[in-house]
Structures are given as C-alpha cells and as structure tokens.
C-alpha cells in the first residue's frame, strides 16, 4: 500500500477550499402576477429601481417602468410566450444597456444589440453603453460649425445641416422621407473613402421587415454598409422593442461621438415610436392625455434628441462629461459629434398635430416634404417656404453661403408669383424674369434618388443658375445642360472645383464658371 502523507492531503484540500465562496449568495426574486401584450406585473421586487433590467426564466430580459405600492410593472424585451403567472423574476441591479463596438459596423442588429443578419456574432471588443443616458451638459458642447453634406442640392444650399444638429424630416406617407435620409447616408461614402468616416446608424422603428431588407440592400449596393449600423425593430416585434429601438440607435451613435468621431443617426420614424410608447403606457395603466398619448410623450422625444451634440474639442473637458459610461473611461476623445435626422409622418399634411408640433419644437429645423410637389415631379419634394434650418447656416462652406444666399428667397418669391401668373398674362418684365429663372432653378434642384452631388459641383451649378447664365436654356433641357456643364468642369477645370471645395470663390473662379456655362448653353438655347 502506498504511503499516504497527511500533510499533502491537507495541503490539497486547503487549496481546493480556498477557491470556494463561503458567503451566502443573496438574490432578490419576484413572482409574475400577470403577463400579456409585452407587459408583466411582478410581486415581491420591493427594491427594484425604475429603468432596471430584470431577468425572467429562460433568460428573457425585461425592464421596470412602473413602481407601484404592491407590485412593479415591467415591459418584456423579446418573445414572452414561455412566461406564465407564477414564473420567477430576478433583479440584475443594472440599467438597460447595449454592447457596442467597431465590429457592429456593417451589421443589422435588433433593439438589444443582437445580430439578426445571419452573419454570426459581433466580433471585437464591445463596450456597455446605456440605452437611457443624460444628454451632455452645456459645458461639454460646442456650437455647430462643421457642415454635414447630404449631397442633396436643395438641402445643402437652402436648409443646410451641421454636424451635431437635429433636423426633422416631416411629410405624409410616400413623399420620399426615407429616401432623403438614405441619400444623406450614401453621401458619406466620400468621407469614408477619404479616411474620415462619418459613422451612420439607421434605426428602423415599426417598419415592415421587407422594407428594412430593401433599405439594407440599397445601402449595400452603394457601398454604404461599410460605415453603417442598422438597428431594426420591425412591425412584428413587440411594442417595447419598437419603443426602445431609437434609444439603442442613440447609444450606438454615442459610442462613436464620445470616442471623438462624427456620427449620423436616422430615426425612421418617431411617429411609430410614439404609438408603441402609447401602447406600452396604456397597458401599464398610465393615465392618457391628448390623442391618448401619455403625458410624458414630449419628454420621450426630447430626451432622445438632446443626445445629439457636437462635443467640445478638448479631450480633457470631454473626459469629464456628465453621465459617462464606465466602459468608455480612458478612451474618450473630444471633437466628436452626433447628428440626428428624426422622421415624422403626418396625416394629410397636418403639421399642427400633437407629435409633429412636439418634435418641430425640439429640433433645430425641419425639412417639409409635400405630396403635391412629389406628384408633380419635384423630387426631392421639399417645400422651401416652410422648411428651415435654425443653426446649419453657420456650418455652410463659404463658397456655398455666398452663392446660395438668395436662392431660398428667390424660390419663395417664384412660388408666390407663379400662383398669381395663373390669373393673368400681362406681367411686367421683372416678374417674367423672376418666374422664368425660378423655373430653371426648380429644375436644377430636382435630383434622382441615391445620386448625391458633391458640394463643389453644387456650388458651380447654383452659381450659374442664380446669376442668369442659364436664362437662355430651354426649361426641359436644364438637366442636360447641367450634366454637360459638370462634365466639362470635371475634365478641364479640376483645379477650379478643388478651390470651390476649400470654400474659396473669387473673380477668377466665377470667370471660369461663366465661360463654361456660356459655351454649353449655346447647345441648349431656344
């Protein structure tokens, strides 16, 4: 028999026991009283906090929204058919978060950040970003001074958007709202190719799965998925998933913003998010207000949109930002931005309804799309008269500001005079000129979907249009004139375009533009 050495045995036992935990593991557990329609009432979680994540049997996550005397009301984030009365629920003692990292770019994820595009798990380092977070304080922000080029002539010239701005896209259904937002995303490819990417997040809230698949296909076709994350909460997802989807999009955008990079988030659309929130609130028996929306529906959108900001350039100030997630400490950089393009759908052009007026008052301007313009072939169907950008003017490049300064006013005047012109033909010469030039400007501002125009080409085209070098061109030939004019500039005057891009516009540049315009106009004159 082998010699058994007691000291060795006791040493092994000591080593084994040193790794075992002897303290009692305390878990707060509650019981489901009632479940249905994506909402559960739970008894026993007396210490639960508002906004806290809960874990149900089978790993399903929930979130506490209502704290009542004898129970808590929670929303269920996912498929809840396995949850029954009497099921146990555990507190997690953390607020709802989503894991974000560089590996998320190019992927389609759900509200909880899980990939749903069949391309496997998200790789690389991931950081915990809270879904709900306080917006950066005034000290940590800086004014909007840098343009966010959309590639859409009508927007970049007359309703410019700056990095860190919130610009609402509003209009009836089928007026091209999503197309405007996708154009803005596709136009960022120029910056991606240059090595200065603007990371884009497209949040699809309550849309058909087939529509979302089409949008992802469009982005892939134009090479835009290389710098885009799609957050999808389809119409078939439970209301809580649709309600939280924009918050997930904001959390993803904040990761890029707080690490010193520009990001653009599109919320498509917030009307459906408000409807989902109304559903959740009514199921939780919160008192209804106007149009049966809960009283805090304004706060729902304001706290979401306030998270868009241009962060102070100083790394030191940015690192001291309020409500910074623990996971980001040490990698925070200044100078980042998050631009928001929320979309709102109106009913029969009624911008004075509850949700549209709320979001108009929160944002820094709106782009109003009109069904009549859309049907008459003006696309993008932007009504210039009631579309505004409250801060973007400071962000325009100098050359664009100089050239497009009067364009908005001219077009508003043209619309007014055109309405009068229908009643009588005896118009004086200056009125006729305004109408004729307005028609040509209108043609110049038309643009097919998914074909963004670079800023220097926009400046060149708008210069010749507003200064009357196209007055001799037949209206229906304006688009052909534009195509030829830009081709000549691209082939023979690359330096001029480069100077315009840098913001410069002087007599030498305008002489080149005049000369080329006159040469090309001969071909398309009456």
Swiss-Prot record:
One of its GO terms (cellular component) is proton-transporting ATP synthase complex. This is ATP synthase subunit alpha. It comes from the Bacteria. Belongs to the ATPase alpha/beta chains family. Gene3D superfamilies: 2.40.30.20, ATP synthase alpha/beta chain, C-terminal domain, P-loop containing nucleotide triphosphate hydrolases. Keywords: ATP synthesis, ATP-binding, Cell inner membrane, Cell membrane, CF(1), Hydrogen ion transport, Ion transport, Membrane, Nucleotide-binding, Translocase, Transport. It is a peripheral membrane protein. It is found in: Cell inner membrane. Its EC number is 7.1.2.2. ATP binds at residues 171-178. GO terms for molecular function: ADP binding; ATP binding; proton-transporting ATP synthase activity, rotational mechanism. Produces ATP from ADP in the presence of a proton gradient across the membrane. The alpha chain is a regulatory subunit. The record marks 387 as: Required for activity. F-type ATPases have 2 components, CF(1) - the catalytic core - and CF(0) - the membrane proton channel. CF(1) has five subunits: alpha(3), beta(3), gamma(1), delta(1), epsilon(1). CF(0) has three main subunits: a(1), b(2) and c(9-12). The alpha and beta chains form an alternating ring which encloses part of the gamma chain. CF(1) is attached to CF(0) by a central stalk formed by the gamma and epsilon chains, while a peripheral stalk is formed by the delta and b chains. It catalyses: ATP + H2O + 4 H(+)(in) = ADP + phosphate + 5 H(+)(out).
């Amino acid at each position: 028999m082998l010699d058994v050495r007691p000291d060795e045995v006791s040493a092994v036992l000591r080593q084994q026991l040193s790794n075992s935990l002897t303290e009692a593991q305390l878990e707060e557990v509650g019981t489901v009283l009632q479940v249905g329609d994506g909402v559960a009432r739970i008894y026993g979680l007396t210490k639960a906090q508002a906004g806290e994540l809960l874990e149900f049997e089978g790993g399903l996550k929930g979130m506490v929204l209502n704290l009542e005397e004898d129970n808590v009301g929670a929303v269920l984030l996912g498929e809840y058919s396995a949850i029954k009365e009497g099921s146990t629920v555990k507190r997690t003692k953390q607020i709802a978060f989503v894991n974000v990292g560089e590996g998320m770019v190019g992927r389609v994820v759900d509200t909880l950040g899980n990939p749903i595009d069949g391309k496997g798990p998200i790789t690389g380092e991931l950081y915990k970003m809270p879904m709900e977070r306080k917006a950066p304080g005034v000290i940590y922000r800086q004014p909007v001074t840098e343009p966010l080029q959309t590639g859409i002539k009508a927007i970049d010239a007359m309703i410019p958007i700056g990095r860190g701005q919130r610009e609402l896209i509003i209009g009836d259904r089928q007026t091209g709202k999503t197309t405007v937002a996708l154009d803005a995303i596709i136009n960022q490819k120029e910056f991606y190719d240059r090595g200065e990417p603007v990371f884009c997040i497209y949040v699809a809230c309550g849309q058909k799965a087939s529509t979302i698949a089409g949008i992802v296909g469009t982005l892939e076709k134009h090479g835009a998925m290389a710098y885009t994350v799609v957050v999808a909460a389809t119409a078939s997802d439970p209301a809580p998933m649709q309600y939280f989807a924009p918050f997930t999009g904001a959390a993803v955008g904040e990761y890029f913003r707080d690490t010193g990079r520009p990001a653009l988030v599109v919320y498509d659309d917030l009307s459906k998010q408000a409807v989902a929130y109304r559903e959740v609130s009514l199921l939780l028996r919160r008192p209804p207000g106007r149009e049966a929306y809960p009283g805090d529906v304004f706060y729902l959108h304001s706290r979401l949109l306030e998270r868009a900001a241009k962060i102070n350039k100083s790394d030191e100030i940015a690192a001291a930002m309020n409500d910074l997630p623990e996971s980001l400490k040490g990698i925070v950089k200044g100078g980042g931005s998050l631009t928001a393009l929320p979309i709102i759908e109106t009913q029969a052009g009624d911008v004075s309804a509850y949700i549209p007026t709320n979001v108009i008052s929160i944002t820094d301007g709106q782009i109003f799309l009109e069904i009549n313009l859309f049907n008459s072939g003006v696309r993008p169907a932007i009504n210039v008269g009631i579309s505004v950008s409250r801060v973007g003017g400071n962000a325009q490049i100098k050359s664009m500001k100089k050239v497009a300064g009067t364009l908005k006013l001219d077009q508003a005047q043209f619309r007014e005079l055109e309405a009068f012109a229908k009643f009588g033909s005896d118009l004086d010469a200056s009125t006729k000129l305004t109408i004729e030039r307005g028609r040509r400007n209108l043609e110049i501002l038309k643009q097919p979907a998914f074909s963004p125009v670079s800023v220097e080409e926009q400046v060149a085209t708008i210069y010749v249009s507003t200064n009357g070098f196209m007055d001799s061109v037949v209206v229906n030939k304006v688009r052909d004139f534009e195509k030829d004019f830009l081709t000549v500039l691209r082939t023979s005057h690359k330096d001029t375009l480069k100077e315009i891009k840098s913001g410069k516009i002087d007599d030498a540049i305008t002489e080149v533009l005049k000369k080329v315009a006159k040469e090309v106009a001969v071909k398309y004159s009456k």
